[in-house]
Amino acid sequence: MLKFIQNNREITALLAVVLLFVLPGFLDRQYLSVQTLTMVYSSAQILILLAMGATLVMLTRNIDVSVGSITGMCAVLLGMLLNAGYSLPVACVTTLLLGLLAGFFNGVLVAWLKIPAIVATLGTLGLYRGIMLLWTGGKWIEGLPAELKQLSAPLLFGVSAIGWLTIILVAFMAWLLAKTAFGRSFYATGDNLQGARQLGVRTEAIRIVAFSLNGCMAALAGIVFASQIGFIPNQTGTGLEMKAIAACVLGGISLLGGSGAIIGAVLGAWFLTQIDSVLVLLRIPAWWNDFIAGLVLLAVLVFDGRLRCALERNLRRQKYARFMTPPPSVKPASSGKKREAA
């Protein structure tokens, strides 16, 4: 049972999402509706995109804490370009290129300059946040064109154009990691770096690609953010990096690298977003959101750690069982010997 849970973390994450959807339905029947699902999905799109990017980085046994700042910086660039009169396609492509460049810079620091990922991305977190504030002067960007907001307007089955794009990206990333040699290279790099090199995997290039795609996903999340709310505050993206990492951990992405799946990260992002909707249903103040999300994350980490220790004990027991000599069995004295002694 323990091995099944460890090897199928996506199933346990799915069960958690289903339970969190069904149980509040006993309090309010209207909660069990397609409208609720589309509402939660719309709110979860930003975190889903960030979780997909974070998955690539975490699979290579790295971590990126600058994605929130990249999201904010890219959202600001999008708003500035649109207000300067550039067309929406040009502004979006430029924004994605900026995110790709920011992620590439993170990858160079980690893969080529050998700076620990947490240290490098802590530095770029401040750098990108500073660039964002320098561009805006600490002010909000408002007056965005209506065509940007149309990207998040319901298009088909209550899902927006960006929502359908997110679904396509999830399916593509899941296929890429599971079915292609390129995708398996991310797992090999995080599981055994030296072994991957001996197999011919270009581990430095894989890590740079992981950080670059992570930055691109953060830029796309910035576009989604701007299209959903219609303006860009000066604190856009703050704290999103921690939520993205939490979503990945909840979905079974290992902090030690080399294991996990995109679907698990998506379910983790959905679960964290759904917590917010349940708190609204229960009329719990919004400032409890981070506390409860953190509590859930800690519980999952403790459970994951205990599960890992239990599995390691079982593996050791199975490995050394054949070397352990059974205790000598004591045979009862025969009845004949008992009579002779008498």
UniProtKB/Swiss-Prot annotation:
From the Swiss-Prot or TrEMBL record, state where the protein is found: Cell inner membrane
According to the record, the segments passing through the membrane are 14-34, 39-59, 70-90, 93-113, 115-135, 155-175, 213-233, 252-272, 284-304
Under the heading InterPro entries, the entry gives: ABC_transp_permease (IPR001851)
Task: Enumerate the Cytoplasmic topological stretches.
Answer: 35-38, 91-92, 136-154, 234-251, 305-342
User: What keywords is this UniProt entry annotated with?
Assistant: Cell inner membrane, Cell membrane, Membrane, Transmembrane, Transmembrane helix, Transport
User: Known CDD domains for this protein?
Assistant: TM_PBP1_transp_AraH_like
Q: Which Pfam families match?
A: BPD_transp_2
Q: How does it sit in the membrane?
A: Multi-pass membrane protein
Instruction: Give the principal location in a single coarse category.
Output: membrane
- The record places the following residue ranges in the Periplasmic compartment, namely 1-13, 60-69, 114, 176-212, 273-283
**A cellular component term, taken from the record's GO annotations:** plasma membrane
Alphabetically, the GO molecular function entries are: transmembrane transporter activity
The role this protein plays is: Part of the ABC transporter complex LsrABCD involved in autoinducer 2 (AI-2) import. Probably responsible for the translocation of the substrate across the membrane.
Family note: Belongs to the binding-protein-dependent transport system permease family. AraH/RbsC subfamily.
Query: PANTHER family recorded for this chain?
Result: ABC TRANSPORTER PERMEASE PROTEIN YPHD-RELATED-RELATED, AUTOINDUCER 2 IMPORT SYSTEM PERMEASE PROTEIN LSRC
Q: How does it assemble?
A: The complex is composed of two ATP-binding proteins (LsrA), two transmembrane proteins (LsrC and LsrD) and a solute-binding protein (LsrB).
> What's the protein called, per UniProt?
Autoinducer 2 import system permease protein LsrC
